[in-house]
Structures are given as C-alpha cells and as structure tokens.
Amino acid sequence: MKRVINALTAAMLMAAIVPTATRAAEPTQAGTQGITQPVSGVLMHPDYIKAVARQAYLWGWPMVNQLNRSQTITKAPHPGLMGGILPVAPRGKIGMLHDYITPSETFVTCPNQDVVYGLGFFSLNDQPVIIQVPDFGDRFWVYALYDQRTDQFGELGKPYGSKPGFYLLAGPEWKGEKPEGVEAVLRSLTNLNNAIPRIFMDDTADDRAAIQEKLNQVVAYPLNEFDGKMKTIDWKNTPDIPNPNADKASSGETRWVIPEKFFDQFPQVLESVPPQPGEEALYAQFQALMDAAGKDPAVKKLLVDTAVESEKQLIQPFFQWKHNGTPAGNGWNRSRNNAQFGYDYFNRVATAKSNMFENRPNETQYFYTDFDGAGAQLNGAHSYSITFAKGEEPPVKGFWSLTLYNQHHLFSENPLKRYSLGTKNKNLKKNADGSLTLYVGPSSPGKDKESNWLPSPKENISLYIRAYWGEQAILDGSWKPPVIKKIH
C-alpha cells in the first residue's frame, strides 16, 4: 500500500495537465526563430521541477524584490517622507530627504550617511519622466537610475560632467522626440525603474543649510507636466506620510521577497523584463515550468516548497560578505560588476540580498568585511583600530567613508548619532606620522581620540568602505583596505 501511495504522489507531481499535442512556443526575439522550443504535455518529474525552480528563484529574486519595493513606495499620496524617515512618492515622481538618513530606516540595507538620498519609482510604459538636476557647483552628486534587473542605465552625475537642467527618462517602447529644453534622453531596457539621487553633504551645520536650496530642486514628474521651468519642493517642510507598517517592529530589512508568493509574481517578471541576448533558453524553460504549474496544483505546491527551501539554502548565505564580490586584501572583499551585472547572476543576487542599489564601479567602489585581520568575526563588544598609512586613505576624486553596520547591515542608534567617518568629517585627528587611525568599539577610546570613534552595538557587526569616484588605484584594485586590528 505504501508503495502505491508513493507512486500516486509522484504521479501527481509529474503530471502537468496540459494537452498532449506538442507546440512550439513563439520565439521571444528574432534570433530564436527556427529553434525548437520546449514541448508541452511532458511529465515533469519532481527533481526536474525542483532543479528549474531553484534556478528561477535565484535568477528572478532581484527582479521580484524590485517589483515589491516599487509597489510599496508608490502608494504614497504625494512626495514626502514615510513615517518621517523614508523618501516616497507616487509612481512617476520622487521624494527627497533633507538630511542624512536615520537609523530607523529599514527599506534597504547598507545606507550611508555621507549623502542626502532621494527615491522614486517609475512605470515608463505609461509615459516618460522628467528629472531635474540643479547646479550643484563643486559638490559631488550622482543620480543612479536602475532598471528592473537592478542594472543602472544612463549616465547622470559629476563623474560624467552632466550639466544642470532637465533629463528625460524613457522606456524601451517610447518613440517620441527629445523635447526642446531637455538636455538628454536616458533610455531604460525595462519599463519599471527607480532613481536614487545621492548628494554629498559635509557633516556640518553650515553645509546642511547651504544644501537645502539645491535639494529643493531635485524633483521628478511625468513628461506631460514639463513646462521648461525648474520646479521646487520644500523637502524640509513637506508633510510626512503615515507608515502603514509602523506597528510592525522590525530589526532587519523589510522582507521584499516572500518565498511562498514568489512564483505568483514570477510570471510578471517574465512578461515585463525582456531577455538579454542569449537568455531566451532560460525564459523558455521558466515559461514551460509556469505553464505546468498553472495546470497542476501538485506542481505549484512543489514550486512553493522549493522557493521556501531556496530562500534558506541559496539566498540567505549571500548576506555574508565573503559571498559578495572578490577578495580585496587584508580580509576585505570588494564589489564587482555592481549595477552593471549583465550575466553575472551570482553578484546580482548577492547585492540584492546584502546591499541593494550600489552604484557602478566608476561611480563608487565598495569594500566590506565581517572579519578582523586575524579572521575572527567582528563583534561590537570588542574594540578595533583601522589605520590608514600616511597618504593611503582611499584615493578618490569624490569622497570616502568607513561605515559600521549591525548584524542586519543597518545602523544601530548610538548617543553620538555617528555611523560613519570620512571625508565629511572635518575634525578627524591624524597621528604624528601623518597616518589616520579610526576606532570601533562599545566605549570611547579616550577623549583625545573620540572624534575618530565609531560606537558599536554589542553584537556581530560589519565594516564597509565607500570610495566615490575612485582614482585608478581604486578601479584597478591596487589600493588595499587596511588591516582591522583587535585591541586587547
């Protein structure tokens, strides 16, 4: 009897209840014409279903993540700060902070307190979007524009010599002409996109005041609202938007991918994100799997079970920095292919899990670690020193910083309200030999060293160096991050 039950169970999983006649799927691109497509009506056995489902989960995780973020952020009735914390806006517009982001932020891991952030999501199949660029003068700035794959498109920022003015963001189907008064058209390969402006600000009262006028001109809106005049929003006094999840305490990043719902959303990704050259075969396998699941509840259940398993086995390990990028020396890893992932599915999903929305390598290089120089896990109950030899601070044309994150890759509030140190800090003290030592620990390293101290929570922590607009030594990897020494 047991053997009969097992056989029936297997048969339910294998049977994709579809017509037995074979059919060739329509080719997704001209290059696939004449290539045989998967046959419908085959009996997919459980291990095959699981193998393809695991690949689909790994491949599609960043795009489902992006989809869910967009649906949450664009519920805002007007541009502003959700809960007084996170910039949000209706679809086609943008919200801006007016100061550094706070420790209460859990929308995205690895925030930084060197820049003032903005955030907006766009559906460019509705119509193009205009985004404004003020005259930032000598201040570093970059607008990172991401498609649904989390690859950047367009070039907009100080590293590119972008002019102040108006820029048009267009989707793949838009066939209009560049309007008069618009500097350039920046075209995305997907219709779902988001923009994250990053505007550098010194950690001084004077610069906080000086930057406000420029921030108020960082505005985005649909093309049909464009009149050639620079619009302004007083971001500091814009009414806050209630956070619908304010009563749901969270110690980590918001869960943007729910495994049990992943394969309900995955068909939308296949529909809205066109394949890259050479990905047509992947799409064909994924679509055949979804067709089978749509006709057989047993197949669908196995997909859900596989998604739950894959979240634990495939995705969660990417939260460890050793699985993100490549070794950079002295126990650190460095980002690779950030925001221009292409076929690099490994680093795309690693970044989406651990530190989504990085900048391109020429805009920013990231160095990160969970370990000290001896290979031991960093823990905020201990104290550490990081010394940059004279002239060996990160060589940049923009700015650099060292940030401390808690076990969730977020800020843990401290009395100094200090979460990073670097270019923005005008009171860092150098050693007599010209070197610079920064300190990490739960207690002050001494009054004379306190300006160089990052207070740490008593839990596992990680350290993170940003090098914005790096010099050649940053780009080619010849610059190495310093050793992290545990202070005994």
Q: Where are these predicted regions, by residue range?
A:
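Gram-negative bacterial Sec-dependent N-terminal signal peptides
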Residues: 1-23
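A compositional/structural signature for long, glycine/proline-rich flexible linkers
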Residues: 25-488
